[in-house]
């Protein structure tokens, strides 16, 4: 089992956004989030809290045009930071799953820290992607965030919406269930010696 600090500090600057992100996978869920997209701040705060990942994010971007660039770019950087902080993945549980309700919404997430990026995202009700949540964040952004994290962190992720009506509740349950599943998958298990794969690498 690795004894190295599982932390990362990643920055990204483009013509569309500027991002500075720090995380600690073995934290307590503390967070300081400022992306200029309030609902996204709320979702990232929930992710940090329920995954027990300490997370600091400062992001600015061309939100006067659309929130898409800033939201997706933060997801990219978060994925890169997760990948860096995981290191060689020695001693991790690797797999995690969680079923999380928020009032009428119910979402299941399954995570495999596999090194093979793959996202299966299903079950959102018809029209969800068109809803404005919190005034600026469209429902379609939820999938974009998971795509960005999954690809850049090297995760296999299944997120399945099993029920729900309120777009806020559905989106929040998605982030929370992903967080809980990721929390299980990234945990260090003292019984695991080396890389949790018969191939010897992830």
From Swiss-Prot:
The EC number(s) this enzyme carries: 4.2.1.19
Keywords: Amino-acid biosynthesis, Cytoplasm, Histidine biosynthesis, Lyase
Pfam assignment, any one: IGPD
MF term (GO), any: imidazoleglycerol-phosphate dehydratase activity
PROSITE patterns hit by this protein: IGP_DEHYDRATASE_1 (PS00954), IGP_DEHYDRATASE_2 (PS00955)
Coiled-coil intervals, chain numbering: none
GO biological process, any: L-histidine biosynthetic process
Protein name: Imidazoleglycerol-phosphate dehydratase
Gene that specifies this protein: hisB
């Amino acid at each position: 089992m690795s004894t190295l600090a599982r932390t990362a500090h990643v920055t990204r600057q483009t013509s569309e956004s500027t991002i500075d992100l720090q995380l600690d996978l073995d934290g307590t869920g503390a967070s300081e989030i400022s992306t200029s997209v309030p609902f996204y701040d709320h979702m990232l705060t929930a992710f940090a809290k329920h995954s027990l990942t300490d997370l600091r994010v400062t992001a600015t971007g061309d939100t006067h045009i659309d929130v898409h660039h800033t939201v997706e770019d933060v997801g990219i950087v978060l994925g890169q930071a997760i990948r860096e902080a995981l290191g060689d993945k020695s001693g991790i549980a690797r797999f995690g799953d969680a079923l999380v309700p928020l009032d009428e919404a119910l979402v299941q997430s399954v995570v495999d820290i596999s090194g093979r990026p793959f996202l299966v995202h299903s079950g959102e009700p018809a029209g969800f992607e068109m809803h404005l949540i919190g005034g600026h964040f469209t429902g379609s952004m939820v999938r974009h965030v998971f795509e960005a994290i999954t690809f850049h962190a090297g995760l296999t992720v299944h997120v399945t919406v099993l029920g729900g009506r309120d777009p806020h509740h559905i989106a929040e349950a998605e982030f929370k269930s992903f967080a809980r599943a990721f929390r299980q998958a990234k945990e260090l298990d003292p019984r695991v010696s080396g890389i949790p794969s018969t191939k010897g690498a992830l």
